[in-house]
Regions:
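Alpha-helical adaptor scaffolds
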Residues: 1-67, 72
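Extracytoplasmic/luminal low-complexity segments enriched in Pro/Gly and acidic/polar residues
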Residues: 2, 98, 102-141
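Alpha-helical linker/edge segments of TPR/alpha-solenoid repeat scaffolds
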Residues: 8-15, 41-52, 78-87, 111-129
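Aromatic-residue detector
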Residues: 18-21, 54, 74-76, 94, ...
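TPR/TPR-like (Sel1-like) alpha-helical repeat modules
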Residues: 24-25, 60-62, 78-101, 107-111
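TPR/TPR-like alpha-solenoid helical repeat scaffolds
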Residues: 33-42, 67-79, 100-117
Length: 141
């Protein structure tokens, strides 16, 4: 929270300091993971892709893995590596719940590089209650 305030006031050095403190000091891995993601975002904004990748290479809680892939895709897109960006964005899209609003954002990034993740119908690990109920109703007809 403190880092966000600093960032919004254009005090990125203080925001970085606050996020680094969380990474080193927080007792909860989720907080450390979130701080790494946010700090990586600041590094991407600064154009320091090497530092951003180093932060994203650290272990994060499983729930944040699709967001790490999204950030890696952003780096590769900015670095003009659309083939590897595609792979990262697809991993992110497939890792997010089908109903997560952020998934549409990742899908837009994929569309921007010429990829439609819905073409093959792969939703890897995601279940849709509406498709399940449709299948069940067809079985009973």
């Amino acid at each position: 929270m403190v880092a966000k305030v600093y960032y919004e006031k254009a005090q990125s050095a203080k925001a970085e300091e606050a996020l680094n403190w969380v990474i080193k000091s927080a007792s909860e891995e989720g907080y450390r993971s979130l701080a790494r993601l946010r700090l990586a975002g600041l590094m991407i904004d600064k154009g320091d892709f090497a530092q951003a990748k180093a932060l994203l290479a650290e272990k994060v809680v499983a729930e944040f893995e699709p967001l790490v892939e999204d950030r890696l895709g952003d780096i590769d897109t900015l670095d003009k590596h659309s083939d590897t960006a595609k792979g990262h964005y697809l991993k992110s899209w497939r890792g997010l719940d089908a109903h997560a609003p952020y998934r549409k954002y990742v899908e837009a990034k994929l569309n921007a590089i010429g990829v439609d993740p819905t073409i093959d119908g792969t939703t890897s690990g995601v279940t849709s209650s509406s498709s399940k109920s449709t299948l069940e109703s067809k079985d009973h007809q």
